[in-house]
């Protein structure tokens, strides 16, 4: 993907004007929704460090860089659908093709927490 491409999150905004600024660290995601969308983009672009840095410290022990990278690379990310949003939760569906090119849907209810003016992913419940 180059800077002239539409953002993976489905906003219909250029990637460079949407989630890329969060992934490269020039801005912090201002809301749980913005963080969730940027994390989807991080999976699509294999930005594992961003995923780890935006996971709440209480949960980081459950994630390894290698496991995240392997899962992100094994799948071809198709689209993101936002179902419902509150201040600190996001329900979404992430559509992707798995390593066998089979269409899959990851349906999650994610919880986020704001600390020191930064949003973090805490956990998710899956359908």
Predicted features and spans:
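Short Cys/His-rich zinc-binding micro-motifs
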Residues: 2-13
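Short, surface-exposed charged micro-motifs
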Residues: 6, 81, 109-111
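Cysteine-centered loop/knuckle micro-motif
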Residues: 17-19
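Short Cys/His-rich micro-motifs in 6-15 aa windows
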Residues: 21-29
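Short, aromatic-enriched amphipathic alpha-helices that serve as compact interaction elements
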Residues: 30-44
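Short solvent-exposed beta->alpha transition segments
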Residues: 49, 53-82
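Surface-exposed, charged secondary-structure patches
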Residues: 70-105
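Short beta-strand edge/turn micro-motifs at domain boundaries
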Residues: 105-127
């Amino acid at each position: 993907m180059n800077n002239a491409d539409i953002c993976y999150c489905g906003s219909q905004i250029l990637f460079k004007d949407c989630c890329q600024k969060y992934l490269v660290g020039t801005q912090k995601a201002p809301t749980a929704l913005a963080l969730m969308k940027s994390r989807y983009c991080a999976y699509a672009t294999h930005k594992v460090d961003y995923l780890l840095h935006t996971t709440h410290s209480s949960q980081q022990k459950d994630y390894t860089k290698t496991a995240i990278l392997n899962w992100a690379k094994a799948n071809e990310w198709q689209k993101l659908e936002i179902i419902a949003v509150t201040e600190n939760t996001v329900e979404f569906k992430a559509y992707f093709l798995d390593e066998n090119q089979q269409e899959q849907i990851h349906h999650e209810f994610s919880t986020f927490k704001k600390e020191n003016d930064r949003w973090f992913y805490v956990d998710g419940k899956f359908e």
